[in-house]
Amino acid sequence: KIYPVLYVGGTIRLIDGLKDINVFFQAIDEAPFKVATFLVPDSIRMLLSFAKSKLSEYASKIDFIETGAAPISQEDMLQLCHVLPQSRLYNTYASTETGIVSTYNFNNGNCLSGCLGQPMKHSSFFITEEGLVGCKGKTLMSGYWNDMKTTDLIMQNDTVVTADLGYIDEQGCLRLQGRNDDIINIGGYKIAPTEIENVALSFPGIKDCVCIAAVHPVINQVLKLLVVPGMNYNRKELVSFLKSKLEAHKIPILYEEIEKVQRTFNGKIDRKSYR
């Protein structure tokens, strides 16, 4: 992402995440023209939670925001569209192994959850029999340095098969459903935790959450929802809300309040720490 900006004579300002939100707005203030930025979903949630009004004041100066690296909830997508009605807001599918494969402007009047758009001109994608996303194109890596064994696990015949579960909709857009290694098996049902999390995050009393597998003394493995509560959090109301939005086997049995959700350096939920 750095090279194209420098190639066309643009300026890049690097900031150390959103440890200080004021630094983010200061960087925009110092730019003589409109700006574009990449923000992981966790950073977007921070801006919406703590600086929504201020962000709206910068609407005319933000050309576009690109997000990726982790799933963004539809609730956050809708809020961002409301705050920045004229800005382009892109949800991008990319990785170190594949480069940028597709992107989707969800501020075009049709805000679709989990949608990552149609393939770029230099790329293509397909879905394997196992439901995994496969990628082809000029931006694929040639392999891991000095590690052909690991390379062969995900790359064959100039094709990278990811661990992402997804499908291609009627418009030819890629729709992600979660990670294959994150799927939770409950009574034979394979459940993507992101689906439960996205619905829960649309409940007004929740700041953040993570859905995990837990052991129940009677019915073995069940879903457990760890919740970072907001000011108006009510567990009974949350359960009723989830029951109105999800199928019965996707309703968490156990609930626990926590101070924060463990995340990786790039804003993804650190699911390994909950296993």
Regions found by a protein language model. Give the residues of each.
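Glycine-centered tight turns that cap/initiate beta-strands
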Residues: 61, 86, 122, 205-208, ...
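Beta-strand->loop->alpha-helix junctions that form or flank phosphate-binding loops
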Residues: 89-97, 115-119, 212-214, 256
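AMP-binding/adenylate-forming catalytic core of the ANL superfamily
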Residues: 137, 143, 150, 165-250
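Conserved ATP/PPi-binding loop(s) of AMP-dependent carboxylate-activating enzymes
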Residues: 118-122, 126-154, 189-191
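Conserved AMP-binding/adenylation subdomain of ANL enzymes
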Residues: 1-35
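Gly/Ser/Thr-rich phosphate-binding loop
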Residues: 34-38, 50-111
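AMP-binding/adenylate-forming catalytic domain of the ANL superfamily
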Residues: 246-269
